[in-house]
Amino acid sequence: MKILVLNAGSSSQKSCLYEIQSEPSSQPPSPLWEGKVDWTHEQGYAEIEVKTSTGACLQEKIAADSRPIVISHLLATLWQGDTQVIDQPNEIAVVGHRVVHGGAEYRKSVFITAEVKAAIARLASFAPVHNPANLEGIEAVETLFGNIPQVAVFDTAFHAHLPLAAAIYPGPYEWYEQGIRRYGFHGISHRYCAERAAQLLDRDLSSLRLITCHLGNGCSLAAIQNGISIETTMGFTPMEGLMMGSRSGSIDPGILIHLLRHQGYSADKLDQVLNKQSGLLGVSGISADLRRIDQAIAAGNDRAKLALEIYIHRLQSAIGACLPHLGGLDALIFTAGVGENSATVRAATCAGFEYLNWQIDQDQNQPSAQDRDIATPDSAVRILVIHTQEDWAIAQDCWQLIQTNSQS
């Protein structure tokens, strides 16, 4: 069975094609085909990159007049040109989409219907950057592939069973009745990493108490017990929680009232500042990219040093806040761009917990230390670095839904 996965963002579109012969393996396979569109490098143009498992590559820049047309152009390289891996589109059995916000009603992956599309559009007010991009991908597939089955895999679904004490904000109860509650995000990544941790540790997932740290441009933690998310740092939107690349994370809401009343801020300006001009970028004045922050620190830049210190401080605080809900910890997991590649962040974070005997093996804590345990043998918890593979998790959900549907 060939499964196409689309992972749409506001500025990029990533896709890959998997082939699953039987039950999906525990080890993620290499995709037959991988494609990416990036709209950020030059205004009015999209950069397309494609590679296949046989080594064929394509790089091109095209006019970006219509995002759906660009997505269709990318997907057509599956059966056209040097990167062709299938003869015709109908060889693909199902298309899976990462959908950022599924609200309270979508607690698991579902086949996409008109009703599901309407819900994704309605929930765009909760995720205005991502849900519209997810819909673009869905509609591009409809245009290109016709009535092929499509599956929505929701980033919020893994957190759908948060205890009410963790899900409800301490405002008027009417907020909760209106859907204003904590949803959590990065759920596909948190779930994948929890399952992969159980494999690496040779333990049953239901026996593990885990904290997963998804640290990329967006950052969130999840406390996982019995394979279920019981606490997470993102909330109603992906702005809550940890300091991020360009997002502030949690701040005193009184600051926002002050800015609205006394600094002439509009809601749109607040949105721009909190989402695009804060976090590592806002404090350092340099970049949202931790690699550039590290370079500036090495050059003696004090604001870059302060930005990293705040980042670590808030990360340590969030990890500490998760511990009482788990009643202990079996493994701490680092994943995503920063989590997987920054040995500095991992070491600095765990240094705050040395009094609990969380010990990193410095020889194992290398930048490319993926899918391995980097804790010392006598550490009280295992410290894992896992390469998150959201696309493979989406493909697995598609396979499972197709199998279930065929048996019903």
From Swiss-Prot:
Q: List GO BP terms, alphabetically.
A: acetate metabolic process; acetyl-CoA biosynthetic process
Family annotation (PANTHER family): ACETATE KINASE, ACETATE KINASE-RELATED
PROSITE patterns according to UniProt: ACETATE_KINASE_1, ACETATE_KINASE_2
Q: Does the keyword Transferase apply?
A: yes
Molecular-function annotations in GO:
acetate kinase activity; ATP binding; magnesium ion binding
Report the protein's function.
Catalyzes the formation of acetyl phosphate from acetate and ATP. Can also catalyze the reverse reaction.
Could you say which residues are annotated as the site Transition state stabilizer? H186, R247
Main location class: cytoplasm
Biochemical pathway: Metabolic intermediate biosynthesis; acetyl-CoA biosynthesis; acetyl-CoA from acetate: step 1/2
Which protein, by its recorded name, is this?
Acetate kinase
Q: Which sites are catalytic?
A: D155 (proton donor/acceptor)
In the record, the note on similarity to other proteins reads: Belongs to the acetokinase family.
Assigned EC number? 2.7.2.1
Q: Name one GO cellular component term.
A: cytoplasm
Task: Report the domain of life of the source organism.
Answer: Bacteria
Record organism: Cyanothece sp. (strain PCC 7425 / ATCC 29141)
Q: What cofactor does this chain's UniProt record say it requires?
A: Mg(2+); Mn(2+)
- What are the binding positions for substrate in this chain? R98
Compartment annotation: Cytoplasm
Residues binding Mg(2+), per UniProt: N7, E390
Q: Where does ATP bind?
A: K14, H214, L215, G216, N217, G218, D289, L290, R291, G337, V338, G339, E340, N341
In terms of Gene3D superfamilies, this protein maps to: 3.30.420.40
Q: Is Secreted one of the keywords? A: no
The top of its lineage is: Bacteria, Bacillati, Cyanobacteriota, Cyanophyceae, Gomontiellales
